[in-house]
């Protein structure tokens, strides 16, 4: 367990430019604390001491803001950066060297029994606020953009963005027929669009009212 902790600290120092020392990481990185607690809880879970496992995971959630079910299967090298609001479900599987940012959910849809949560391959990056929901596989070397909602399987070496998530890159090459609504920087503002529509409608009504007034005045002058 101690050697695993040393590996986790070394991994964080390698990946996070804000990490200045092993001592700082050990004391202040909530992602490290959550994963360390998960390993203890997972041991109890695997030995069918479910209540103890859940107590450990709940205490870790209160302390870190990260909820990892002790039944989840997590490979080596997981880095949870910032971490607040991360949720990992009971039947989720995470491969080696994955990176999860704050607000990520590896959850279910409420429709499935047994295997309910996703399986992530190795070297997967899941951006902040993204949701991966359902019992499907996300391949190796996949990147999921911030706030994406993934509801279907993603092959290896792809980048997915949007709600619902769609693949925009495969093996580093852009998919040219991807729809324009996947542009998350220049997404349309629904309030602005509605105001513009109302402005057009007001102008149309003003023209119609002016036409009626002109017709009425012409009738009076006869």
Question: Where on the chain are the PLM-derived regions?
Answer:
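Terminal amphipathic alpha-helical/low-complexity segments used for targeting or macromolecular assembly
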Residues: 1-59, 175-222
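Solvent-exposed, flexible loop/coil residues
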Residues: 30-31, 36-39, 72, 78, ...
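Structural signal for interior beta-strand "rungs" in well-ordered beta-sheet cores
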Residues: 61-168
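A structural signal for small-residue-enriched, beta-sheet-centric alpha/beta enzyme cores
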Residues: 166, 170-178
């Amino acid at each position: 367990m101690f050697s695993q902790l040393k590996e986790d600290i070394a991994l964080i120092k390698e990946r996070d430019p804000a990490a200045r020392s092993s001592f700082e990481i050990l004391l202040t990185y909530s992602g490290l604390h959550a994963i360390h607690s998960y390993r203890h809880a997972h041991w109890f879970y695997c030995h069918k001491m479910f209540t103890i496992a859940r107590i450990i995971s709940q205490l870790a959630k209160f302390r870190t803001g990260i909820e990892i079910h002790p039944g989840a299967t997590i490979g080596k090298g997981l880095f949870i950066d910032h971490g607040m609001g991360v949720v990992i479900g009971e039947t989720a599987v995470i491969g080696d060297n994955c990176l999860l940012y704050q607000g990520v959910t590896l959850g279910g849809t409420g429709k499935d029994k047994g295997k309910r949560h996703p399986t992530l391959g190795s070297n997967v990056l899941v951006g902040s606020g993204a949701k991966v929901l359902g019992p499907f596989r996300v391949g190796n070397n996949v990147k999921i953009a911030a706030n994406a909602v993934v509801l279907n399987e993603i092959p290896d070496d792809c980048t997915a963005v949007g709600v619902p998530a769609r693949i925009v890159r495969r093996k580093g090459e852009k998919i040219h027929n991807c729809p324009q609504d996947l542009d998350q920087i220049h997404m349309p503002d629904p309030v602005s669009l509605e105001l513009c529509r109302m402005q057009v409608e007001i102008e149309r009504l003003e023209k119609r009212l002016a036409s009626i007034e002109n017709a009425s005045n012409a009738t009076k002058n006869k």
